[in-house]
Structures are given as C-alpha cells and as structure tokens.
C-alpha cells in the first residue's frame, strides 16, 4: 500500500497542481513568518481551492496565538492543523476543541530521548510527524533538509499513525520507506531548487521514486 504523501510549503499554483496530479494525499501551507515557505492565509486559501475533496489541506503553525489560528482557520478552512511548536498535550486538546479539527503533532528527533514525549500525546494527537531536529542556530523548526536515524522509530507499532519527514528526497525515500514502513511521508526541501522554491520536475522525481520503491512492497504484500 502506497504511503500517504504530503508536499509541504507550497506557494504556487503550478506546484499545487503537480502535487495533486501526482496523487498527493496532503498539501501543506506554512504560516511561520521566519520560514522561506511562509504564505499569507488569504493566498493559501486561493491555492488550496483545487485540492478540496482531492487532498487534505494542512495548516502548519508554530506556537500560534488564538488570533493567528482564528484567521488561518477562517480563511483557509483546513482539514488538519500541524503543530510544529512546543504545544503541550493540554494545549493540543484545547486547540482541537476550539476548532473541531484533527491535529498532527510534530516531534523533532535527533536521539531516542527525543521520542520519550510521544507517549503523552497518544490518544490526543490524531497523527504524529517525526522530523529531524534543527541544527544549532537555525531559526526554522523544520524544512532544513537534514535527516535523522530512522531506526529510532523501530519501537512504533501499527497503532501509531505518523508521517516521516526530515531531508527526504528522491535519492533516499526508498531506503526511508524500507527502514520505517512509514504510513506517511512529508517532503518540502527535497522538491525544491532553493529554499521555498518548489520544482515541478523535482515533485515528479519524488513521486517516481516513491512509486518505484512501493512496487516491490505491493508485490510482497507489505
């Protein structure tokens, strides 16, 4: 079974169109002003229109205020909120209650210790996303184009729904899927020519690589 595929940090209609044509299950818009992938909520709403009913629209936020979330949810009408900050389990529950939307909680990973917090969110977050921990000095919590040791996720069983992120690209996504059997994958910098500049050709190459990697898994029934 092919994993869910999320193309994140979209900013142009061409990139959205190609992601949808290639079968992206999720498209992500980033509302963190320090990111080169930042987009205004009203523009994101226009770009998201062709995706409605075809792919889940994900709003990516980092420790947002209620006012910021109000504006994003009102304009974009996302299918899911991706929380990429330091939101506590209690705060996640509050956000879910306020907006009636499922939440994907992000964990930044470098060592096994970074995963100890996950258990507190099981049954609270609807899905997890595991990304590489940002290098020292980086202002960006994600989208840094670096990977982590995927074997750290070996303790996860089928009851934990998650997406794998962090430096995925056409050259390493097959190995990532082989090691983790991740039910979902998330790519941003791996389909760019420069930070925030999505490449239609690179989106194609990424999907081609996933489909090639998935073929033997389908044949073996994995």
UniProtKB/Swiss-Prot annotation:
InterPro entries: Aldolase_TIM, PRAI_dom, RibuloseP-bd_barrel, TrpF_fam
UniProt-listed Pfam families: PRAI
Catalytic activity: N-(5-phospho-beta-D-ribosyl)anthranilate = 1-(2-carboxyphenylamino)-1-deoxy-D-ribulose 5-phosphate
Pathway(s) annotated for this protein in UniProt: Amino-acid biosynthesis; L-tryptophan biosynthesis; L-tryptophan from chorismate: step 3/5
EC numbers: 5.3.1.24
HAMAP family: PRAI
Matching PANTHER family: N-(5'-PHOSPHORIBOSYL)ANTHRANILATE ISOMERASE (PTHR42894:SF1)
Family stated for the protein in its record: Belongs to the TrpF family.
Protein name: N-(5'-phosphoribosyl)anthranilate isomerase
């Amino acid at each position: 079974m092919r994993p869910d595929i999320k193309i994140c940090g979209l900013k142009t209609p061409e990139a959205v169109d190609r992601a949808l044509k290639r079968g992206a299950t999720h498209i992500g818009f980033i509302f963190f002003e320090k990111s080169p992938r930042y987009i205004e909520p009203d523009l994101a709403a226009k770009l998201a229109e062709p995706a409605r009913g075809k792919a889940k629209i994900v709003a990516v936020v980092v420790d947002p205020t209620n006012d910021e979330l109000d504006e994003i949810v009102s304009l974009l009408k996302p299918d899911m909120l991706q929380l990429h900050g330091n939101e506590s389990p209690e705060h996640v529950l509050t956000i879910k209650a306020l907006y009636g939307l499922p939440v994907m909680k992000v964990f930044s990973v470098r060592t096994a210790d970074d995963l100890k917090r996950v258990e507190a969110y099981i049954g609270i977050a609807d899905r997890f996303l595991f990304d590489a921990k940002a290098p020292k000095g980086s202002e960006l919590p994600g989208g840094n184009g670096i990977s982590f040791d995927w074997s750290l996720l070996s303790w996860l069983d089928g009851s934990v729904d998650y997406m794998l992120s962090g430096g995925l690209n056409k050259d390493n996504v097959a190995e990532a899927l082989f090691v983790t059997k991740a039910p979902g994958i998330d790519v941003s910098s791996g389909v760019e020519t420069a930070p925030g500049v999505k490449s239609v050709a690179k989106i194609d190459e990424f999907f081609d690589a996933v489909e090639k990697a998935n073929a033997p898994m389908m044949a073996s029934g994995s």
